[in-house]
A protein has these predicted regions:
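Beta-propeller folds
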Residues: 1-149
């Protein structure tokens, strides 16, 4: 049996696998959140739960979105932000959702991603520079972000 200190460290204080960062759509049709696949997997994915069907699905997963095989690259600015907020997760650690928009935005690896909640369709905008803190507009058509700031 694994000792408590080892288990506590491996599961990052028993937070791996726990859902977090919930957002509710304006009509209450969808709840979006971040969660890894299991208590052994540190990479958060973006999930959506449908009130009409009661089904939960992964709508964005960095392992499938980043196909260069090198994994996630984190900028100095993003590392500093994660340290300030004591973020210990990996993968998708934050996203922007607006209750009136059918889309969600997040950033990783010098790319800006827009995901359709219902369709799970992902648009990847590779910008070639470090970006962080994307914010989606109420209608979901525009995304603002910070770069070199």
């Amino acid at each position: 049996m694994e000792s408590f200190p080892r288990q506590n460290a491996r599961t990052r204080r028993f937070t791996i696998g726990a859902p977090r960062s919930f957002s509710l759509s304006a009509g209450g049709d969808w709840i979006t959140f971040l969660q890894s696949s299991s208590s052994e997997d540190p990479l958060n994915k973006l999930w959506a739960w449908s009130a009409s069907s009661g089904q939960t699905k992964v709508i964005a997963d960095l392992e499938t979105l980043i196909d260069n095989g090198s994994g996630e690259t984190i900028s100095r600015e993003e590392l500093a932000r994660r340290e300030r907020v004591r973020e210990i997760g990996a993968g998708i650690v934050s996203y922007s959702a607006n209750g009136h928009s059918p889309n969600i935005a997040f950033a990783s690896n010098q790319s800006l991603f827009k995901v359709g909640i219902e369709s799970s369709e992902v648009s990847d905008f590779t910008l070639g520079r470090d970006i962080f803190d994307p914010q989606i507009s109420p209608n979901g058509n525009l995304i603002a972000y910070v770069s070199e700031g």
